[in-house]
Amino acid sequence: MKINSNTIIIGKKVILVPYKKKHVEKYWKWMQSEEIREQTASEELTIEEEFENQESWFKDDHKITFIILDKDLLLENEKDSNGYSNENDIKSMIGDVNIFFNQYEDEGTAELEVMIAEPTSRRKGLAREAISIIMGYGIEHLSTITKKYIVKIGESNQPSIQMFKSMNFKQIGSVNVFKEILLEFENGENNINLLNLKNNDNYKSLIFKNWE
């Protein structure tokens, strides 16, 4: 979605940046993993198809995609190379986080997805922070079109299910035919306060008009 095409969101542990062409090669390499494709319900693509995906997502008015950077790793790489570079950006990539708007009859429903592709970056709270930040972004900047969030998680992925439940997502119904559990978060004042998004000093949005 073009609305986030020049937006960088900085948190305590992660930095969210728009999915650009420079990120495609590493993203494509992640998706060569059968495990990751299974977890994300993704098809195996050629690198040319992945470039087409990136361009399509950029133009899609119903999808917001951010690449997740490990903030400490980025700062470490910048220190080693005496400043910021595209190479440091790529080295610090650990996954992605998305909001989808186009799949539901219920207007205002947005589906969240998060992937931590780098095994060494898992179980460190990075996915949780990325989800909190993108939800805060949605509540702050997309409040007119985002009334509630949902996630679909494989029933065997208990760590992810428990993470979302701890963020005040509630299970809706039982396991579906795809062996997925549906969880929902209503954008009410109490829920937003529980996430502590409004008063989070580690959350800020920066706009870079010509960021590449």
Curated annotation (Swiss-Prot):
GO terms for molecular function: N-acetyltransferase activity. It comes from the Eukaryota. Keywords: Acyltransferase, Transferase. Gene3D superfamilies: 3.40.630.30. Its EC number is 2.3.1.-. The keyword Transferase applies. It is an enzyme of class 2 (transferase). It holds the Pfam family Acetyltransf_3. Transmembrane segments: none annotated. Residues 34-201 form the N-acetyltransferase domain. InterPro entries: Acyl_CoA_acyltransferase, GNAT_dom, NAT9-like. Belongs to the acetyltransferase family. GNAT subfamily. This is N-acetyltransferase 9-like protein. The lineage of its organism: Eukaryota, Amoebozoa, Evosea, Eumycetozoa, Dictyostelia.
